[in-house]
């Protein structure tokens, strides 16, 4: 059986190419945690898509490199046109510093507009190039796994091309707090793109929590235990601590060559205790802080001078960039100063290497190390910690680990956790590690070795892939609307079959169109374009003439069913030949007549004044919130307020309501995405539909039964019962439909509604997890649909 295909997309390929002739190339393995991690991914047929590490400008070079890389399962992405502005600019000078809490460089702040815009355009273009390569090689059924901040726009490009494509996105760096992330000008675009993925992964719960908070604060979406809910779509957000391939390190450390290296290094170090640091030469790795802490230790522990050494391997990453030359110079300064202070002719306390070393030599160093010192100021995971533990078979060295490294949440139980900014604390930790008893070392090592052994790369990748496939194929996403849970078991919603809608419309003799208002007949309601007051609701400008034409057809009855007040519907629809149902059908009129109250008898509304008082109290204390009032319901809306503060205020409000004005009232409370609604029991669009239909029947002489229903809306969860009201199996039985006037409710025969399955279309706007049969993306699609229906009027 063929293995499933996985397309791994990252900035760099696992190999770096070097041109050795016009048509010849050599390759070296690329450094980096992702490369190390995915070496153990064997369950999939993997194709790796990324930059080959070299610019290739000629066609022959691109062709020969592509052919050679294909033999290694790699597909090159050529970024010559945008590489500098994209990689060195937007990725490394804007995204990377913000994600690591450094902020943007001062020179960018002084020339932000020009610099940022040009680099962001390069970023978009580069992501488009990545997309083009993925599209060229994609086969149906492939899973596309996007990695890191370099390709944050890629998920959206992929989903726009093929909405059924399986797409995951994983971040290997920290994700900053929402306050830090807010400083990014393109913050919304990047978040929205990432949310189009089926699964979003992070190393730690802290990073995931920051991402969720940023989405809530900036986009105004809701977060649940499963992930982010945005207009009915749920994006799963989960935590996957990355591991290593432990057997590779364990087996390597047992090789005879490595054992010889171990003996040699021990002899070279002259019996001194070894403190090891293995880091990229980077501002976030805290190497200067490490040196200062070691200096502090030597100052306060004279007995250890000459008996302990610090070997720092600082792997160069971005040669030629000013910031990295500064950190390199700073490290060299500290090394020279400390060695001059505590060194001797025969030995120095610090050896600093500006290079990477052979893998076998690295494993040998790990194996004989007494203390691994990790002082990252911010770090994604730090796989060096796991590599060290895997190689420690005999020595059982101690891990000192920064609490700001992602590994701190995984390996903290078997390590000494430190704040790298606290020099004295790190110095004390060095002393604790060097003086630790053998039994305590064994205990800590056993804890961490067990974790590293069982949380391998293979496990990490399997977990991510299984959850990605589970989300897509098994539909185990939580199914939530923007207002409340609809419960499990909703059928998959399909895109509206426009051809069938129009064809059945043209064949029918008595059509009923039920249309919502907000988000349906208004302009598209995006989170960044939210209304501030219900009175500002206006009909989509492109609908005015089309709606008038639709309502002029004697075969068609149009009902606008909204929670809006009567005056709002009068203002927008008073000139049309249609029915208006205000406040969820509590008030009804044909535009040629007067409003009729359809409030059920014995409805108690004494609770309204008390609830209104509480709502006003919180409105005054929540900037950006507002109150919507009607005769049978009240809504407190905080969609324009700070999202986190609004949610906190909503929680407090509910406590006030339940303790006071609604404690014994016959009301329903609906907690929406960014609102709290209190209304009389039974006030939903579905429950009002019988009364509305009865009124229409009473006032309209119908020669034939209703044989076509189109119901379109952007409704709250509690109102989605309107979608199921007309399900064909329900119309087979007689319905009790209330008519107006003093007469008793009449029994109306099922001949009033004679609806077949192919003639009923329930449509949700912008939601795919809904009780409706079908969905449309936005009200723009409603405009187009109504325009096409008009061409079949009087058919």
UniProtKB/Swiss-Prot annotation:
It catalyses: D-glucose 6-phosphate + UDP-alpha-D-glucose = alpha,alpha-trehalose 6-phosphate + UDP + H(+). GO terms for molecular function: alpha,alpha-trehalose-phosphate synthase (UDP-forming) activity. It is an enzyme of class 2 (transferase). Residues 4-469 are annotated as: Glycosyltransferase. InterPro entries: Glyco_trans_20, HAD-like_sf, HAD_sf, Trehalose_PPase. It holds the Pfam family Trehalose_PPase. One of its GO terms (biological process) is trehalose biosynthetic process. The keyword Transferase applies. Its EC number is 2.4.1.15. Keywords: Glycosyltransferase, Transferase. NCBIfam families: PRK14501.1. In the N-terminal section; belongs to the glycosyltransferase 20 family. In the C-terminal section; belongs to the trehalose phosphatase family. This is Probable alpha,alpha-trehalose-phosphate synthase [UDP-forming] 4. The gene is TPS4.
């Amino acid at each position: 059986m063929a293995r499933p295909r996985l397309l791994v997309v990252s900035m760099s390929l696992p190999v770096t190419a070097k041109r050795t002739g016009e048509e010849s190339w050599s390759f070296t393995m690329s450094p980096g945690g992702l490369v190390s991690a995915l070496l153990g991914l064997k369950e999939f047929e993997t194709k790796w898509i990324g930059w080959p590490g070299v610019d290739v400008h000629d066609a022959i070079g691109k062709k020969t490199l592509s052919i050679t890389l294909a033999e290694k399962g790699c597909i090159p992405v050529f970024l010559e046109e945008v590489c500098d502005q994209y990689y060195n600019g937007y990725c490394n000078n804007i995204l990377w510093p913000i994600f690591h809490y450094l902020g943007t460089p001062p020179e960018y702040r002084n020339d932000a507009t020009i610099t940022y815009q040009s680099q962001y355009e390069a970023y978009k273009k580069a992501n488009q190039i990545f997309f083009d390569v993925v599209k060229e090689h994609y086969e149906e059924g492939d899973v596309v796994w996007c990695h890191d901040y370099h390709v944050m726009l890629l998920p959206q490009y992929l989903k726009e091309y093929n909405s059924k494509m399986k797409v995951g996105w994983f971040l290997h760096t920290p994700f900053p707090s929402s306050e830090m992330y807010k400083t990014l000008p393109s913050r919304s675009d990047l978040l929205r793109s990432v949310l189009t993925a089926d699964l979003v992964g992070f190393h730690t719960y802290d990073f995931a929590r920051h991402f969720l908070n940023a989405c809530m604060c900036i986009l105004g979406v809701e977060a649940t235990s499963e992930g982010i809910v945005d207009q009915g779509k749920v994006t799963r957000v989960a935590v996957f601590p990355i591991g290593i391939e432990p057997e590779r390190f364990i087996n390597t450390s047992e090789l005879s060559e490595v054992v010889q290296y171990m003996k040699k290094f021990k002899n070279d170090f002259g019996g001194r205790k070894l403190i090891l640091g293995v880091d990229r030469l980077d501002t976030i790795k805290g190497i200067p802080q490490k040196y200062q802490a070691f200096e502090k230790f030597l100052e306060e522990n004279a007995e250890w001078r000459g008996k302990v050494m610090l070997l720092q391997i600082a792997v160069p990453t971005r040669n030629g960039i000013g910031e990295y030359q500064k950190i390199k110079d700073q490290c060299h300064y500290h090394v020279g100063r400390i060695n001059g202070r505590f060194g001797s002719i025969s030995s120095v306390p610090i050896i600093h290497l500006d290079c990477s070393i052979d893998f076998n030599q690295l494993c040998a160093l790990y194996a004989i190390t007494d203390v691994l010192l990790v002082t990252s100021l911010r770090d994604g995971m730090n796989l060096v910690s796991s590599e060290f533990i895997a190689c420690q078979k005999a020595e059982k060295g101690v891990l000192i680990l920064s609490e700001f490294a992602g590994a701190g949440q995984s390996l903290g139980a078997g390590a000494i956790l430190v704040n790298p900014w606290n020099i004295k604390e790190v110095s004390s930790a060095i002393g604790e590690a060097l003086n630790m008893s053998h039994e305590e070392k064994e205990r800590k090592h056993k804890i961490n070795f067990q974790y590293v052994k069982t949380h391998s790369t293979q496990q990490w990748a399997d977990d991510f892939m299984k959850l990605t496939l589970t989300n897509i194929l098994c539909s185990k996403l939580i199914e939530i609307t923007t207002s409340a849970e609809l419960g499990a078991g909703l059928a998959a919603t399909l895109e509206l079959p426009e051809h069938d809608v129009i064809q059945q419309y043209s064949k029918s003799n008595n059509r009923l169109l039920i249309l919502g208002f907000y988000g349906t007949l208004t302009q598209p309601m995006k989170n960044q374009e939210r209304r501030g007051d219900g009175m500002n609701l206006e009909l989509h400008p492109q609908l005015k003439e089309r709606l008038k034409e639709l309502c002029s057809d004697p075969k068609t009855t149009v009902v606008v069913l909204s929670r809006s007040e009567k005056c709002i519907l009068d203002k927008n629809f008073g000139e049309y030949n249609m029915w208006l149902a205000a406040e969820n059908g509590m008030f009804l009129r044909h535009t040629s007549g007067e409003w009729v109250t359809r409030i059920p008898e014995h409805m108690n509304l004494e609770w309204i004044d008390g609830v209104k008082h509480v709502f006003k109290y919180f409105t005054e204390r929540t900037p950006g919130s507002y109150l919507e009032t009607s005769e049978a319901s009240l809504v407190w809306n905080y969609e324009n307020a700070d999202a986190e503060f609004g949610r906190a205020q909503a929680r407090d409000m509910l406590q006030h309501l339940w303790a006071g004005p609604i404690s014994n009232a016959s009301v329903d409370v609906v907690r929406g995405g960014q609102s709290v609604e209190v209304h009389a029991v039974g006030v939903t669009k579905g429950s009002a539909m019988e009364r509305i239909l009865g009124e229409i029947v009473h006032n309209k002489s119908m020669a034939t039964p209703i044989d076509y229903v189109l119901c379109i809306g952007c409704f709250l969860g509690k109102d989605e019962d309107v979608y199921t009201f007309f399900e064909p199996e329900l119309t087979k039985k007689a319905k009790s439909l209330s008519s107006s006037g003093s007469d008793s409710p009449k029994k109306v025969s099922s001949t009033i509604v004679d609806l077949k399955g192919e003639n009923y279309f329930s449509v949700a706007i912008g939601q795919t997890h809904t009780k409706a049969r079908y969905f449309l993306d936005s009200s723009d699609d409603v405009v187009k649909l109504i325009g096409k229906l008009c061409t079949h009027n009087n058919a």
